Amino acid sequence: VEWTDAEKSTISAVWGKVNIDEIGPLALARVLIVYPWTQRYFGSFGNVSTPAAIMGNPKVAAHGKVVCGALDKAVKNMGNILATYKSLSETHANKLFVDPDNFRVLADVLTIVIAAKFGASFTPEIQATWQKFMKVVVAAMGSRYF
């Protein structure tokens, strides 16, 4: 993927405003609530049976931060996102057996959470650039599935 300077700047600016400790837990919790079938991957997280339990679950919050930490690596390695996610993709494909469509679901929900947080400043133009970036991340996360 070729990134223009404007796209790189936009993605860095959006990500620079993201509080990983806030957005990560909110995004993962929303995925588990809105798409309940994703809960099957988090059996070791304890109670994820209700929205309140999910929102208050410290393991969900911690993993949401981990997810955003991994996204931070993509922002910092925009020239080689595929290589950046090679190992993570292999783990999700071959050890965790995560349906790769869930990466798209998470990307969409993360975008919704960011848009809700940033409000009108998350313009359609910024969203278009952000979603291009997320599509590249989703493709990289699915790259080791055979």
Curated annotation (Swiss-Prot):
Residues reported in the UniProt entry to bind heme b: 63, 92
Query: Pfam families from the entry?
Result: Globin
Subunit architecture: Heterotetramer of two alpha chains and two beta chains.
Tissues/organs with expression: Red blood cells.
Q: Any remaining note in the record? A: This hemoglobin differs from other fish hemoglobins in lacking a residue between 121 and 122.
Which cysteines share a disulfide bond?
none
Name under which the protein is recorded: Hemoglobin subunit beta-1
Keyword terms, alphabetized: Heme, Iron, Metal-binding, Oxygen transport, Transport
Identify the InterPro entries for this entry.
Globin (IPR000971), Globin-like_sf (IPR009050), Globin/Proto (IPR012292), Hemoglobin_b (IPR002337), Hemoglobin_oxygen_transport (IPR050056)
